[in-house]
């Protein structure tokens, strides 16, 4: 388990290794939230399916072997984690724009995660993946619908790629 803070302690990021399966994901969420908050909050979901807890902005992501959570009382947040595999390379036409010519797996994974993070951050807009433009070199995404630029943080390991952002 790892818990870190960002933006002058206004954001908390948690990462936990878990077993496979839906039950392990839910148990992992509860363990991680307890470690982050000192209690297990009630998680509700809004009409878009986005998780909500009282007093915090929250985003949750799962991938094989991991659960990641980001919390903030002050900022809207988004997070995504993806295990390293060539799965995203097979579907680049679904999420990469013609002006995002990422050919290496690392860049493709970062672009995928950054777009998923951005989608969560702007959940009320229901953005299509083609309505976001990623600059992997600058850790930057543009929401093309509302012309808003955001910076994202990325972490790349041999097991996973993690991105998160706030606004």
Where are these regions (language model features)?
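Core catalytic alpha/beta fold that binds nucleotide/phospho-ligands
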Residues: 1-167
């Amino acid at each position: 388990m790892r818990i870190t803070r960002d933006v002058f302690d206004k954001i908390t990021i948690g990462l936990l290794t878990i077993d496979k399966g839906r039950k392990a994901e839910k148990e992992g969420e509860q363990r991680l939230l307890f470690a982050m908050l000192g209690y297990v909050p009630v998680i509700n979901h809004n009409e878009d399916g986005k998780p909500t807890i009282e007093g915090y902005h929250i985003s949750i992501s799962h991938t094989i072997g991991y659960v990641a959570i980001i919390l903030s009382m002050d900022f809207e947040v988004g997070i995504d984690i993806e295990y390293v595999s060539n799965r995203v390379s097979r579907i680049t036409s679904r999420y990469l724009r013609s002006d995002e010519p990422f050919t290496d797996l690392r860049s493709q994974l970062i672009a995928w995660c950054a777009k998923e993070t951005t989608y969560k951050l702007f959940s009320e807009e229901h953005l299509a993946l083609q309505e976001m433009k990623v600059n992997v070199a600058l850790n930057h995404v543009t929401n093309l619908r509302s012309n808003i630029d955001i910076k994202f943080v990325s972490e790349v390991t041999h097991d996973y790629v993690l991105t998160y952002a706030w606004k």
